[in-house]
């Protein structure tokens, strides 16, 4: 499932109605005036980046991804302005995949039609669960009924490519509730389902509860049982497992996210956004005041720039590539089997041990994690970093 190496664009919208208990993303509250000011600054950054990149050939951008936060807090007119600005300043493929992240209850039929008219052709909805008790525990403001209504409305508005996010291993959940969630979501027939385990992140409400002893993590063995049972059920429902946490009907894999897993270039725009362009990792500033100040002066809002070394590129290609169920091909990383394992000769025996344990498959043309290997994927990937 190797994608092309055309670049993509990520647009960060750092606003949400309310911070969820588990969320560690760069996001916060806003009003209409702040969102409008941000859209203007974002359009200015687009023009700044285009000028800075004009001396380099980057090819045709064939994905745009609005992430957050909750991008659907922007009006369809604001989303249209951003897309139009991108098209005026960059070469955007006429068949580009344009994704907008959204939350149930934050969508109206009018806004859905407006997003579709603006050029958005893929909708990603943060469902997380179809159990109202679990949704309340997560700090979500929607209900299962909201999800059903919004998916139906999205279909009526013309969306034929919808992703629904599901979360498992939430305190208060069980193997049974996890499978019930999958059954309920699959009845809505989305083209794509993301299936993530809850991670306790520092700074979140859940982490503070954990530190106070008020929250107990789901034990690892139950977390893994939920993952494997969920994966099995998703496959039975006709979804292909193509990345550790992602499942899609054939032909509906996330073209944008594949760029991250296959080391394709991408431009990040907006507060705290990261880019991988011209062999450099660039991170934008995380202060909204600083972002407004720099873009207002016609300056790129970059906080950090790191030029990748050869080892950075090799290590990142292996680390991200092993997230794909099909794994990596040596020719995409270092060339042949011999060249790859000569470069990684110091960890060859450890890799072989994982193979003997049934956690890693090493072939003449590449390697991949097994289902058991996915359970300890970070340990295996760390060998190559």
Predicted regions and their residues:
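N-terminal [4Fe-4S]-dependent radical SAM core
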Residues: 1-9, 56-58, 376
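Short, amphipathic alpha-helical interaction segments positioned at domain boundaries
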Residues: 372-385
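A short, conserved structural fragment
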Residues: 355-365
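Local cysteine-cluster metal-coordination motifs and their immediate loop/turn environment
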Residues: 14-27
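Alpha/beta-hydrolase
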Residues: 11-13, 127
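C-terminal scaffold of the Radical SAM
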Residues: 4-6, 24-52, 60-341
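Short amphipathic alpha-helical interaction segments
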Residues: 340-355
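Minor-groove-contacting beta-hairpin "wing" of winged helix-turn-helix DNA-binding domains
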Residues: 366-370
